[in-house]
């Protein structure tokens, strides 16, 4: 009894120490993960993360004792179910996620196992003797005899994802040397500084965030303007619209201020401004031409001076 209490206290202390040392946790599913895979994952995460396994009842009990000082740990409790473990890290979450998921091994189908994906049998020659044709027929696999061997004529989905693999299906897959499943750690949830979220969030790029943020600002501004309810994104648009209205009123009335006089004059005398535009352009061109001529004249004078010096020393 004393040994169990000591083990429990030791586990509580270890879990508490890891929670205090690391800011991020991957809650990982370890169904069908072999001890060899677990060892390889620990090696891959060396100096970057720590893997901790434990009975769910003990983990939940430990977390509940920590809630008084750290209530944010309550967010972990809903995910402590099934065959799960913890990976603690302070590293880059996307990099650690990829290392956790990288260790996958192909596995043969076992009778009674739930298929995580659809299992297909590809068309092609099996190399098996015709005597086993009845076995294929019993499972509904289309075959023919070609050059003294059994040939599967079309691709066939043998087991659907989520269904249990039957004894006959498992036997056939093993006969064909097909290992349809891959097993490794999966990620149930990510905990980071008091927040929990699915690992797919780690794939959201900065460009996507900026696009979503920009779209949200545009929507808020549009709704605010429609409701005539000022918000930070809509204020600039409201000011511009209001100023346009003030200009419209000033143009139609005797209200005036220095900045509006030129606009009123442009509206009243458009021909004068239209005629002034080509003159301004011509003046600009003449000025540019004059500058070019002046520069050319200076170059000629410099050339003459150089010639004079040549005669002097010749």
UniProtKB/Swiss-Prot annotation:
Record-listed Phosphoserine modification sites: 303
| Assigned keywords, A-Z | Phosphoprotein, Ribonucleoprotein, Ribosomal protein
Please name every pair of cysteines joined by a disulfide bond in this record: none
Report biased composition (Acidic residues) as residue ranges: 293-308
Q: Which InterPro entries match?
A: Ribosomal_protein_uL10, Ribosomal_uL10, Ribosomal_uL10-like_insert, Ribosomal_uL10-like_insert_sf, Ribosomal_uL10-like_sf, uL10_eukaryotes
Per the record's keyword annotation, is Cell division included, yes or no?
Answer: no
- Give the record's GO biological process terms: cytoplasmic translation; ribosomal large subunit assembly
Question: Which segments carry the region annotation Disordered?
Answer: 285-314
Molecular-function annotations in GO: large ribosomal subunit rRNA binding; structural constituent of ribosome
TM ranges: none
GO cellular component terms listed in the entry, alphabetical order: cytosolic large ribosomal subunit
Query: Which Pfam family, just one, is annotated for this protein?
Result: RL10P_insert
Record note on modification: Phosphorylated.
Q: Which family does it belong to?
A: Belongs to the universal ribosomal protein uL10 family.
- Function according to Swiss-Prot or TrEMBL: Ribosomal protein P0 is the functional equivalent of E.coli protein L10.
Oligomeric state and interaction partners are given as: Component of the large ribosomal subunit. P0 forms a pentameric complex by interaction with dimers of P1 and P2.
Entry-linked PANTHER family: 60S ACIDIC RIBOSOMAL PROTEIN P0 (PTHR45699), LARGE RIBOSOMAL SUBUNIT PROTEIN UL10 (PTHR45699:SF3)
Q: What is this protein called?
A: Large ribosomal subunit protein uL10
Q: Source species, please?
A: Podospora anserina (Pleurage anserina)
């Amino acid at each position: 009894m004393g040994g169990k209490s000591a083990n429990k206290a030791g586990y509580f202390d270890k879990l508490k120490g890891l929670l205090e040392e690391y800011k991020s946790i991957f809650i990982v599913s370890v169904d069908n993960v072999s001890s060899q895979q677990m060892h390889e994952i620990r090696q891959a995460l060396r100096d970057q993360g720590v893997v901790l396994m434990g009975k769910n009842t003990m983990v939940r009990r430990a977390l509940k004792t920590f809630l008084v000082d750290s209530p944010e740990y309550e967010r972990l409790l809903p995910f402590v179910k099934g065959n799960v473990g913890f990976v603690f890290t302070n590293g880059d979450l996307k990099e650690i996620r990829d290392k956790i998921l990288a260790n996958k091994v192909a596995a043969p189908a076992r009778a009674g196992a739930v298929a995580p994906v659809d299992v297909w049998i590809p068309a092609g020659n099996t190399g098996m003797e015709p005597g086993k044709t009845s076995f294929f027929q019993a499972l509904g696999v289309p075959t023919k005899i070609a050059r003294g061997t059994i040939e599967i004529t079309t691709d066939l989905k043998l087991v659907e994802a989520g269904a249990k693999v039957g004894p006959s299906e498992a036997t056939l897959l093993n006969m064909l040397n097909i290992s349809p499943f891959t097993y490794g750690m999966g990620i149930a949830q990510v905990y980071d500084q008091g927040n929990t979220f699915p690992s797919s969030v780690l794939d959201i790029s900065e460009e996507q965030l900026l696009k979503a943020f920009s779209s949200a600002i545009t929507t808020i501004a549009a709704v605010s303007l429609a409701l005539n309810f000022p918000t930070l994104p809509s204020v600039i648009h409201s000011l511009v619209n209001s100023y346009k209205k003030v200009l419209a009123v000033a143009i139609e009335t005797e209200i005036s201020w220095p900045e509006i006089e030129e606009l009123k004059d442009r509206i009243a005398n458009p021909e004068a401004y239209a005629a002034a535009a080509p003159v301004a352009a011509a003046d600009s061109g003449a000025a540019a031409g004059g500058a070019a001529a002046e520069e050319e004249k200076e170059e000629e004078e410099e050339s003459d001076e150089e010639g004079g010096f040549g005669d002097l020393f010749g």
